[in-house]
């Protein structure tokens, strides 16, 4: 993604009126923005109740101390302490490298269409930070944002819409603070014991090769808890290498009788893991089924939006459409994955929702839904597992995340 903005006008708003009501304290900012400030159990919330037409960006400055340290903004892979830098918040591939001045990143940008990474590129951004002054701040938005911690006297938080609310909560210790933060955002389900009981082998190539590696590992005294075959759905050969067949059911040529082989693994105390993502290749069986049901996001002209994933095209399952959400949950994850005994999978590609000419069922701009997509994708997986009675047994793991992912993603 290449994101640019043309700023027409940026106006500072000052407080012109304040009124205490039964609901809280109402703040009027020059008649352009109205906030309701409330406090409950030590948490302060500033909720936006009114905004003037035309306001489509939002900046907030929060007082800072020169010796303050700041952490968070989701999964930031280059820096633990965010102080002294700004962090654009947009779910994406991390890219190749973390520094635009290095040769490998420059070459990747030039030769691969801007695939080089920067220090802030992450699958899992989040408009939340934790301060060494023992408070956290969360902004209720899934729009593109940029949290800037470079000024010694204030933090400047930006988002490309007006957030629903801003929440601030403090605690005497970091342990207590994180307890409060996870109570608000949600807590990851506890992992099952089997993930700790040995090696989870990643193998590809079909039954003979993949299950053969398990046999050889056991023969050499290696404790094995799982076998992960991401090509359980088949392979697709492109000009630049082997890819997966994005049609999420077991491939009867590469993995014949896979359910029976999974049963045999289970008898040996070993789990089987696969791979699923929320896109379906347009020459696959599931795409044809989904097209009849109208589960795919559209273009402005009403046709299915197809994403070019490199010599093959895929439909975007529209999780804002309740029927599409239910279909993928029940007919793809449950029927073709859980029901054949699969114990886990990589739930990939939550960070890829396109933003150009994409029309979603709920009518919300994809620029707003893009950062929300990882949480919707996690929720789809979570509900499939929970409704199957396998929560606490099955593990699906994700790279992409955002606000709301925490309680829906097992790993």
Locations of regions flagged by a protein language model:
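Composition- and surface-driven signal marking solvent-exposed, interaction-prone regions
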Residues: 140-143, 150-153, 211-214, 229, ...
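Catalytic and substrate-binding clefts that recognize carbohydrates or anionic sugar/phosphate headgroups
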Residues: 1-194, 200-207, 214-219, 402
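Aromatic- and carboxylate-enriched substrate-binding clefts and catalytic-loop regions
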Residues: 79, 86, 223-411
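N-terminal small/glycine-rich loop or linker at the start of catalytic domains
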Residues: 186-200, 303-316
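Short, acidic/polar
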Residues: 206-219, 324-334
């Amino acid at each position: 993604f290449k994101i640019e903005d043309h700023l027409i006008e940026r106006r500072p708003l000052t407080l012109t009126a304040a009124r205490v009501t039964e609901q809280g304290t109402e703040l009027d900012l020059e008649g352009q923005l109205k906030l309701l400030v409330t406090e409950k159990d030590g948490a302060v919330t500033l909720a936006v109740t009114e905004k003037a037409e035309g306001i489509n960006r939002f900046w907030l400055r929060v007082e800072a101390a020169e010796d303050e340290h700041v952490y968070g903004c989701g999964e930031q892979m280059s820096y633990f302490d965010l102080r002294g830098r700004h962090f654009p918040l947009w779910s994406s591939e991390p890219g190749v490298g973390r520094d635009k001045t290095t040769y490998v990143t420059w070459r990747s940008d030039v030769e691969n269409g801007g695939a080089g990474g920067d220090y802030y590129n992450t699958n899992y951004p989040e408009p939340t930070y934790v301060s060494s002054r023992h408070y956290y701040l969360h902004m209720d938005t899934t729009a593109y944002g940029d949290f800037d911690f470079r000024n010694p006297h204030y933090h400047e938080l930006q988002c490309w819409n007006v957030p629903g609310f801003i929440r601030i909560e403090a605690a005497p210790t970091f342990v207590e603070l994180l307890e409060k933060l996870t109570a608000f955002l949600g807590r990851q389900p506890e992992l099952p014991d089997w993930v700790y009981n040995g090696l989870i082998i990643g193998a590809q190539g079909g039954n003979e090769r993949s299950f053969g590696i398990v046999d050889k590992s056991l023969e050499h005294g290696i404790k094995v808890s799982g076998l992960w075959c991401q090509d359980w759905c088949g392979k697709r050969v492109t000009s630049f290498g082997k890819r997966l067949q994005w049609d999420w059911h077991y491939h009867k040529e590469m993995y014949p009788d896979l359910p029976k082989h999974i049963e045999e693994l289970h008898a040996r105390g070993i789990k089987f893991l696969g791979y699923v993502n929320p896109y379906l290749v347009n020459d696959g069986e599931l795409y044809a089924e989904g097209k009849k049901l109208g589960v795919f996001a559209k273009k402005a002209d009403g046709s299915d939006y197809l994403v070019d994933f490199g010599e093959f095209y895929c439909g975007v399952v529209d999780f804002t459409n309740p029927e599409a959400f239910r279909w993928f949950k029940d007919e793809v994850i449950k029927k073709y994955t859980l029901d054949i005994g699969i114990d886990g999978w990589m739930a990939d590609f939550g960070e890829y929702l396109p933003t150009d000419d994409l029309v979603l069922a709920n009518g919300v701009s994809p620029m707003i839904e893009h950062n929300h997509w990882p949480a919707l994708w996690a929720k789809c997986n979570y509900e499939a597992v929970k409704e199957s009675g396998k929560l606490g047994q099955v593990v699906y793991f994700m790279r992409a995340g955002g606000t709301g992912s925490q309680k829906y993603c097992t790993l």
